[in-house]
């Protein structure tokens, strides 16, 4: 899993040999994925009113911005009837025209990166999956591309990376010591209808393990960087600090945290990608300049929609 953004400066990785980037559909049988999606759909029914409300709210706001986006006092374009009274008062005033602006938000991609760690099990991951579902459906209707990614590890207790480390004599401070699993639930160019079944996989028993956030953000960032869209937004949904027991047991206690801070700082200060985070039950503002904490996972949908509609005011995050 080569990384275009340099993350190796003082951040060691023992081995990348056992890491994987997996399409969600490759992680279980088609039958099981269908079953998990049905399970998600059953949970969706209790949120149906909320979903419809949120989806309509975001769509209304996007479409309103689309309709409101005009340039005034132009030499040519559509006649601006609101300025006609001044010509009646003084015929020497020239006619004023208006023109609709290009719709900036259409040239936008949003990547949703979801923490697939064990502490998200149960209600948090269900709500995250539901929100990802709502978001991709709604933004797709408004011609905004959406990518949905997840991150975890393949194993507890370090997996094959740790076995290899043991075999080679347990070198001191080996760096990250577990097998990464990065999951593509929905690629930016695939339609929601094609990918919706994959979102149920987040509910799969045994999928959610450790979370190594810095490398996951690097991966999502590098995918975004390759996109042709002018505006790129990375939204991280997480429930706190990066944790991997295998790595932290043989490195400094802040090893993963330091890397996360460094990666986020780089993206915030030195890249065109706009990054924001939603912390579920935890304040993540110590890692991200633009961060929101929600206490109850039920708030997630509302917060996501509010944040996104704020972003589409055609203002960059600062």
Residue ranges and their predicted role:
Residues 1-4, 8-318:
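Acidic, glycine-rich A-domain
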């Amino acid at each position: 899993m080569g990384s275009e953004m340099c993350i190796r400066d003082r951040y060691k990785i023992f081995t990348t040999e056992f890491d994987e980037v997996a399409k969600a559909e490759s992680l279980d049988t088609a039958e099981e994925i269908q079953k998990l999606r049905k399970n998600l759909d059953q949970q969706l029914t209790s949120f149906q009113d909320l979903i419809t409300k949120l989806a309509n709210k975001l769509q209304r706001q996007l479409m309103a911005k689309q309709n409101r986006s005009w340039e005034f006092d132009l030499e040519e374009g559509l006649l601006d009837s609101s300025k006609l009274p001044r010509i009646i008062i003084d015929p020497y005033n020239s006619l004023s025209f208006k023109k609709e602006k290009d719709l900036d938000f259409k040239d936008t991609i949003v990547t949703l990166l979801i923490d697939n760690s064990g502490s998200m099990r149960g209600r948090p991951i269900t709500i995250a999956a539901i929100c990802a579902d709502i978001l991709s459906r709604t933004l797709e209707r408004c011609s905004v591309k959406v990518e949905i990614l997840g991150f975890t590890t393949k194993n507890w207790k370090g997996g094959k990376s740790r076995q290899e480390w043991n075999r080679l004599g347990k070198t001191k401070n080996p760096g990250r010591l577990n097998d990464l699993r990065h999951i593509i639930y929905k690629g930016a160019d695939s339609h929601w209808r094609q990918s919706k079944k994959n979102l149920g996989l987040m509910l799969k028993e045994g999928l959610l393990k450790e979370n190594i956030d810095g490398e996951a953000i690097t991966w999502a960032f590098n995918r975004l960087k390759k996109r042709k869209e002018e505006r790129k937004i990375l939204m991280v949904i997480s429930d706190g600090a990066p944790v991997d027991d295998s790595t932290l047991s043989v490195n400094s206690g802040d090893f993963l945290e330091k890397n996360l801070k460094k990666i986020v700082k780089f993206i915030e200060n030195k890249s065109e990608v706009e990054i924001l985070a939603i912390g579920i039950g935890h304040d993540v503002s110590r890692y991200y300049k633009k961060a929101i904490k929600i206490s109850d996972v039920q708030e997630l949908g509302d917060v996501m929609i509010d944040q996104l509609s704020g972003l589409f005011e055609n203002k960059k995050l600062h």
